[in-house]
């Protein structure tokens, strides 16, 4: 018997029992993160890849593929995790529009460690006074196309939240007359080798420094974090979610 007004995929997701694996529909499954997530699914019997009848869609593609993945998730009535970085304000508006119909989790980094780092950065920025300058240093592999990394920018946003202000970003300083702006958050990017992702948030105060760091040794940490986010999204009402919500639900 068909249920009027409910998409078939939404019905199947609602009927899934706790004993059945969560079905992952991968957008761009042949990308680096797509392959890593497929490998993580093989490790975890609680998940399965099902491109046609997914309970959750995961998109780690590119900004140009965002609209197609959102359309596919909305038409299927399933939640979506967006791990794509380098998105602009227009992409943000498209995500907000989709979140009226489905649950959307956007994360520049799906590592659970980075989610905790973000909380620590916000806390440190709140506790330490304005005399502590904040710098974000990140390094990634030679093939990464965007800079600063989405994670670095998200950590800068966390610092701004702690200071209860809007971020004043200073990126890639080069030249002369570049005295640090009051209340600025500086960003520096390094590229080389096969580095999966290094991030340091430096709080430089009077005669002391606090450095909060995270080192990603493999893309598998992002893949496992993406599966944790997918598990969180199953059954969630329409709206926008974050990795902080995932960590708080653990």
Which sequence ranges carry the predicted segments?
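C-terminal substrate-binding/catalytic lobe of Rossmann-fold NAD(P)-dependent oxidoreductases
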Residues: 23-54, 64-67, 130-250
